[in-house]
Amino acid sequence: MGYRKAILLLSMGTTLLFLATPSPAQVDLGDYTVSGAIEAGGMPSHRSGNTSKLEEYRDLPETVVVPQLELFIDSKKKDFYLEFDSLKTGRDDQSYRLRTGRYGLVDVEFVWDQIPHLFNVDNARTPFNRDDGRYTLSSKPAGTTGANVRDWVNANAQPVDLKLYNGLARFNVRYTPTPGWTFSGSYGSQNTTGKRAFGVYIGPSPGSFNISELAEPIDYQTHNIELGGEYAGQGWSLGLKYNASLFHNNVSTLTWDNPLNTTGLGAACVDSAAYNPAAGTGPCRGRLDLYPSNQAHTFILNGAASLPFKTNFIGAFSYGWRLQNDPFLPFTINSAVIQPTISRRSLDGDVRPTMINATLVNNFFRDVGLKASYRYYDFDNRSKRVLLPDGFIVNDQGVTNGTELLSFPYSYAKQNIGLDASYNVARWLTAKLGYGWERMHREYARELLNSNEHSFGPTFDIKPTAWTLFRLSYRRFLRDAHDYDAGRNAAVEIGETPEDVRLSRLEELRKFDQAARQRDRFSFFTQISPLENLTLHGGFDFTNDRYPRTVIGVQKDIDYAPSLGFIYAPLEWLSIFGDYNWERFDWRMQAIARNTGPGGCPDLELRTAENCPAATWRSRGNDEIHTVKLGTEMQVVKNLLNLHFQYGFSFGSSEVRSSGNSAASGDTGLVPATDYPTIVNRWHEFIARLEYILHKNVSLKLGYYFNSYSSKDAGVDLMRLWMGDVETPAAGPNFSNSIGRSIFLGDRGKGSYQAHIGFLGVRLKF
């Protein structure tokens, strides 16, 4: 019915256009000229499957649409202008832009954008009733077995849409009173609302538990303010700018009823300190804090100057404050649990980032280019330390964990130096040599306090002819990691000694961001135009990361991306283009089981890959994406009929192969490592577009769009409201285990679909 109405309105509009006298390209109104364009039409379509992926970030209606609207008013004296344009007017992904001002003096702009984000509107369901951040149940399972939970959730769950709406408004002003002075200001506001999947947990860890997957309420408001001024003199400039970002979370706390406490509903429910899912006791509800409201302020001073000996300087200095002081929630909402002690009621979060950038470029010597750069960034965390002398409550049940903790405000500082020299060896060859140094300093609680990384390598630009270009570059990176010590985390776990902390984290474990690393990076690009109407291009990027001193953790990471493409215009009215890209990522890591038991390696002190090969497992991952694009542009009849065809295809896959952790380790309850099911997705797109120019100001547009998507992901495709028979089929008929007593949204993510969409429209210029 929707597309029939669209076709009827389009036919009426087309008839009126034929009957009307075409307008000139612009309209004179006194001292002003007015020009613009409007496009309107309909989008009949046929869709099948799960369309959440199709409309993930866009709105594709089956009604009349206005894809584009443009208006421009210009003064004949060239002292005033006004521009207005919009895209997809009235849709969920619409945008508007209004700009006006006086040439050379003032420019004012207002922009409005809407961006939808669709997670799932097809199969997510929940038994919870929501009131802002409060999730309540109007009923509970008849018993505490997994079968009771299954029957209850299937009977009481209601559909819920998982999607977000982003509304962004921005107002910009630029004022130039003199050729030297420029002042600017802007204000932006972003509102994000909606719901997305969010998992919560009640029960000890480790131990029995129950999960409830909720539709998390999202209601964020962010304000961004920017003010600045700049003066440009003869050969120099200086500017000062202020930025502010104010974030407010309108729903900062999440509270939910516990389906496994069967003592009653609402106020009739009785809290218990002991969590016993079989008996239906424990906390009546759970509670957690969401993202806190916060603010950031930054001052930026920047400048540039032309110096003697053909030298140019560019520099910037910034200093800021990031502040957050949201009150802490009590440790638990469970009234049967005694609240532990805490030293503060809020964090008083205070981070002072400092940044210095300085660059010198010199071209004094003929055919020689020199460049030196320095960057310093200091993340100075002045937040207060918080003491938990008795530890904390685990998931609203039981007693404190008894581990004395003292928070540590992590800080770091990073310095970078870059030196580059280039030389025009010949008319067709330019060679460049670069060196870089990076020093990272971390606060005491991190495993590695200081690391240095050196990089060096050449770049060559080769242009043997006017129609041929080759660019090759290679860079070698070497990062050290001396004095890696996991025991430094005792600064947080103050009830433990450094030796205790080292044992609990395994001596051989290295975190990849702090581990010694060797990196090789190679890049190649070429562009060849053997004919005036033919251009070929290609490239290859390769990065190889190795972690030579890592036994437990990431050991290797390789990625490479070859690409090919062409543009060919065999005829004046015909052009053909094509591209192929392949990206591949390979990684390897090694891990070791930490559980102890009879046989094998019962002590963490002796638990190494060499001593316990049977308890060690290896994982090898491979991710790759193939993308193909082919198309053509045809001007069949000049200034009358244009055609466009384009086809796109992509194929992506992700594999994880695992081995090891065999029963020979002797550990009780051992689960051998197994391969993860391969994730695969395919995407096809075909576009056909025709433009028939009825008059220089009137054109008819016809289009067809085909889009197909398929995906196979075992971790998502199997999701249902209740997963007990999927996780442990042998636990039936009662399924009285943790997953059997858990509930989910049943959100299967972005399922497969096919869509055929037409477009019938008219574009009118005036």
Please identify what each model-predicted range represents.
Residues 20-22:
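N-terminal signal peptide c-region/cleavage motif recognized by signal peptidases
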